[in-house]
Amino acid sequence: IAVLMNGAGMFKYCPIFDNGDGLLSDTILDYPLGEDTFDLMETVRAKTVSTDFDEQLDVSEHLYGCNLKFFFTKRDVDQLLEQAKGYSDEVRGRVQTILHRQIDKYAYLKM
């Protein structure tokens, strides 16, 4: 659960709706296993304010400042995925690739 704080110090729940597409979780129809993960990442579209995740982040930062921070590392991702034994190596590898790429892309958000 994430929250946002406004200028008056009041908190509201962060509008995070669906992280499924962000992790290419529909492996049957939209994001089949075996296809290039980076190519598939380019096809993902947000479904809220804008279809572009970066545009949504830019708007949020413009309105509220840079309040989104990551408190995890690639090592944390790797350790968590090592424990996710219920998923195939292919699925875990895909999630690892996606999260590592996003950590690199949004390095300025890391705490």
State where each predicted segment sits.
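Anionic ligand-binding catalytic core segments
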Residues: 2-111
